[in-house]
């Protein structure tokens, strides 16, 4: 009975976020008049996908709560960074390459989350993987930060 309830909840969550993604994508096509709109809307889609994967992993009981908290901290940090950068006017001209980098980073995070179980099969602990991914994330952040497309133009 418990397995049926969890399975039903997983299906409901997956369907809900598939619909949310379609609505967001349709909305993006209608109102994205400039790159800032695109960045914000694709950011929303990325957040929706992050929630899908966190929910799926949580209901599948593949990870523990501290790992979910770490994912949320990273996600909130990235969102906060983009919002502060927008408010400070650090994106006077958003290049399409920045969007590609952002989407690539989201895809990379998704691959890391999905491959967690495979890494654990080879004997890696969750704590070690979090540290490795945090270091890689930090390196990626500085590469993006130092990129000529994301630096403030003087």
Swiss-Prot record:
Keyword tags: Cell membrane, Membrane, Transmembrane, Transmembrane helix
Residues in a coiled coil are none
Q: Could you name the Gene Ontology cellular component terms for this entry?
A: plasma membrane
Report the domain of life of the source organism: Bacteria
Coarse class of the primary localization is membrane
List where in the cell it is found: Cell membrane
Q: How does it sit in the membrane?
A: Multi-pass membrane protein
* Transmembrane region(s): 39-61, 65-87, 94-113, 128-150
| Protein name per UniProt | Uncharacterized protein aq_1012
What organism does this protein naturally occur in? Aquifex aeolicus (strain VF5)
